[in-house]
Amino acid sequence: MKNYLCLTALLVAGCFAQGQAQDMHYKEPPKEIKEIALAKLPPTVLVSKDGKWLMELDNVPFLDVAELAKPEYKLGGTRVTDIFGPSRREGYSALHLRNVETKQTFEIAGLPSNMNILEAEWAPGSSRIALILREADGLYLWMVNVANKQAKQISKRKMNRTASQPGPMRGMNPAIRASWVNDSVLIVPAVPQHLGAMPTPPSAPSGPVIQVSDGKAAPARTYQDLLKNPYDEQLFDYLFTAQLVKVEPNKETELGQPAIYLQTTLSPDRQMLLTTTIEKPYSYLVARASFPKRTCVLDLEGKLIKEVDKQPMTADIMGYDTTNPFPRSFGWRADKPATLYWTEAQDEGDPRKHKVEFMDAVYQWAAPFTGEKQLVVKTPFRCRSIDWCDDQFALVNEYSRANRRMKISSFVPLAPEKGLQTLFDVSTDDNYADPGRPYKTSNQYHQSVVYTNKQHSELLMIAPGGSPEGDMPYLSRYDLKKKTNTILWRCQAPYYETIVDVVDPAKLQLITARQSNSEPVNYFWRDVKRKKNV
């Protein structure tokens, strides 16, 4: 019996010893695995507006443990941090400039060591670069002077980038990025001054969360990271509210009142600001983009010029080709100094209930917004986007999810009665038939417009080039009259090569990125007409 008791005591003592806290640390893998995991990634390359410079950004391969351990707030369908930025965004660890002509690479002086660049944006005149740097206590605005290769912080205010969502530049939503007024003046969303401390969670709920049904059965999507209670609403207000600030050399001006922004876009003439803001009441069933919203035009002092639209909460819409019954997709015409355009459903957003010839219509409204809206074009399918050129030529991209079709058509903005001229009508399931996208150039307003000749008879198309051998991207010339496509340049096996930019469309000079199974990404200057590669 005594032996049994002793054995039991030893076992219990062993269990307690095993249950004690231990000083554990993360361990590193073997050298070979570590080298593979931390191998340097190819840089992200952004071409300057004038085509003379490459901005090379070194990608961060992984987030470190300290970043992963930071609190993450899931609000309105978005994940953000307490420093008013997107959660778990890798960013960039270094920035270099490369001269396209000389191929010389330049280091940028003045940037902090161990920096993390969250966003980078060329100025319209290519003389400067705006940066958002992530530091331990917040996000800060910096500027790079391309001429002297110097960088400096240009505002002590913390930036608010909670509205920033993944996009073409790995974390930039074009709707809410920094807006260049000129090469030295920016409009940015900042953290409001005197904001106070972050709300603290209640010790107990103050009451139940009540949801009201209108008695009608309806399908609904399920989203993650939605608001769940009044405390989430307080956090949403605190973290997403931003103050627009005009940052000039040695001067900062607040524009209007703090608000929760979905969109801030400068007019092409840089005299007005289109804003879409979120208003209460919020919803626990849909993401923030479906909350009540107000769209306005402001001047550059923040004063209201015109309220363009106001919408209630839009319930989630289910079904092929269904859409918001309210005006949507507000923007500025790229070829005009200050003309708004938007899309309106002609079938109340539901083609199953309302059979119409045209699902959508696009309207425009020119500043000073005292006249009536004007029809620009009607589309049989849903309007996805418009690529502007001028009053005589534009392209509309439309789609039908129900029919799994995509169409690209041309039209005359000045004469909507002429209707559409279909250029491409393909199945969205047919990769081989994907026509790609039209090449766009910069106009007098530093806006991207469709590149074509004076007769509007030709386009340059950049296509993914789906084929039995895989994607083989190409550049082609499309004849608008004959509706024929001539390939001018194409990726050649065993490489995968994509077009980074068309530096000179008239001379057919390109910058491409080429890689293979054994070669990392490298960049080339290609003169298609002369068949020269550098």
Protein language model features and the residues they cover:
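Beta-propeller folds
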Residues: A17-K529
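Bacterial Sec-dependent N-terminal signal peptides
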Residues: M1-D23
